């Protein structure tokens, strides 16, 4: 069914048709640039636009309106530089001392 159509279009047209019809390569078809864009095939015959219809694009989904006044994570707004300072002070008495090699640490 598609073989005679592919043979008439030449190599570039065949690739273009394969990319447009293949389900896996549907996203790549628009990015591939082909030399058969001029309207004529490799043999010099005029290109018949009725045989290939351009793929129909689905209607764009309307974007959800952006509203940052209804932020759900209310705890996030309470964070400051000193938020966990009291927790660190409470837990510091439970920390184990770290072993040292006996020499000073390098100054970075």
UniProtKB/Swiss-Prot annotation:
It comes from the Eukaryota. The keyword Hydrolase does not apply. One of its GO terms (cellular component) is respiratory chain complex I. The modification Phosphoserine is found at residue 105. Residues 33-72 are annotated as: Disordered. It holds the Pfam family NDUFV3. Keywords: Electron transport, Membrane, Mitochondrion, Mitochondrion inner membrane, Phosphoprotein, Respiratory chain, Transit peptide, Transport. InterPro entries: NDUFV3 (IPR026193). Belongs to the complex I NDUFV3 subunit family. This is NADH dehydrogenase [ubiquinone] flavoprotein 3, mitochondrial.
């Amino acid at each position: 069914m598609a073989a005679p159509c592919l043979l008439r279009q030449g190599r570039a047209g065949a690739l273009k048709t394969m990319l447009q019809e293949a389900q896996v390569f549907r996203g790549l078809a628009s990015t591939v640039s082909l030399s058969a864009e001029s309207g004529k095939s490799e043999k010099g015959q005029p290109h018949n636009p009725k045989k290939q219809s351009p793929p129909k694009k689905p209607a764009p989904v309307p974007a959800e309106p952006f509203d940052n006044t209804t932020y759900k994570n209310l705890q996030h707004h309470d964070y400051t530089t000193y938020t966990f300072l009291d927790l660190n002070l409470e837990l510091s008495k439970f920390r184990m001392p770290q072993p040292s090699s006996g020499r000073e640490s390098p100054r970075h």
